[in-house]
Amino acid sequence: MHGKRAGLALLAAALTLLLSGCFVKTVDELYTLPRHSDEYDRLELAIDAVLSGQSAVYSAPVSGPNQQSVQLADLDGDGQEEAIAFLKAAGDRPLRACIFSRVDGDYHLTDVIEGDGTSFASVEYVQLTGQPGIELVIGRQLSTDVLQSLSAYSYSDGHVAELMNANYSEYRVVDLDGDGRKDIFLLRFEAEQPQGIAELYRWQAGQMER
């Protein structure tokens, strides 16, 4: 127990350094819409159909390295990028990340990640599992409170699977043990916990474990 607490204390100190600006994370790739072309127009038509069908509007992430309303990433590792549109609709679970795959030159909606909240706080594309492709880490602002919601997802065969979900005040995605897979380290401050809570999530035995 003491060893675990000491480990979390060291991680908390590392996160403090990251938040203070001592380490600057570079962006390896910018996820943006393709240039105007037939492909661009087809993607736009596919997204417009979802916008009108769900009475939704664009809802770009408000912070982090990826703040475009529509982003491109090869989520499943097949060599072809998926398009992810970040939208907000009415009703329950209004925040929606819509994933479009390209088939024979056309884009088709393959899955939707729905979540609660008022806005997308951040979006990152990282290698969590060591499997082909990259995972999607989404932060959501729940309300005007400090706490936010963080979820990680994998995408394979046209379907999304949630890997973890937790509330957080601050988080970082870093490879702490040098195995080539990123770990998720988060801090959570609550009124009843004046010292805060530190949690580490890493891929072990086929799942994200805390």
PLM feature spans:
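Sec-dependent N-terminal signal peptides of Gram-positive bacterial secreted proteins and lipoproteins
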Residues: 5-26
